[in-house]
Amino acid sequence: MVKAVAVVRGDSKVQGTVHFEQESESAPTTISWEIEGNDPNALRGFHIHQFGDNTNGCTSAGPHFNPFGKQHGAPEDDERHVGDLGNISTDGNGVAKGTKQDLLIKLIGKDSILGRTIVVHAGTDDYGKGGFEDSKTTGHAGARPACGVIGLTQ
């Protein structure tokens, strides 16, 4: 079992933690999160980005992690970036809390997400179907108010 965590924060009030667990390279990765400070009753884009560089804030994290050269899509789509985790849903207090499993996200192997950045976006991910200029690359999810580098944990 490999476990990882990202402490998410930024220039806004958005903050929290994201945990990852994977039993083996062929097993799905379980992702769980608790993030506060978002707008209430909202959907917020949630993506793993290429770099673990936050020297210039969350913009230094680069584009979505996309080792297979695909277009942006929904988590359940065949055509998607590895880093496309879709949206997280906030409650009436602006807290997003949940768990999901994903077969493309790896903690083990050459396409590992370790050392990369998880980003909470300011807008809703349109899953590449919104018709905006950036829909097929970013899901038109907007600014990056909070992020954290994914690192090993016990």
From Swiss-Prot:
Catalytic activity: 2 superoxide + 2 H(+) = H2O2 + O2
Phylogenetic lineage: Eukaryota, Fungi, Dikarya, Ascomycota, Saccharomycotina
Keyword set, alphabetical order: Antioxidant, Copper, Cytoplasm, Disulfide bond, Metal-binding, Oxidoreductase, Zinc
Regions crossing the membrane: none
Binding, substrate: 144
Gene of this entry: SOD1
Chief place where the protein resides: cytoplasm
Highest taxon in the source lineage: Eukaryota
Residues the entry annotates as binding Cu cation: 47, 49, 64, 121
Cytoplasm listed as a keyword: yes
GO BP term (any one): positive regulation of transcription by RNA polymerase II
Residues reported in the UniProt entry to bind Zn(2+): 64, 72, 81, 84
Any one GO molecular function term: oxidoreductase activity, acting on a sulfur group of donors, oxygen as acceptor
UniProt-recorded name of the protein: Superoxide dismutase [Cu-Zn]
Organism: Candida albicans
Cofactor remark: Binds 1 copper ion per subunit.
Function: Destroys radicals which are normally produced within the cells and which are toxic to biological systems.
Keyword Metal-binding among UniProt keywords: yes
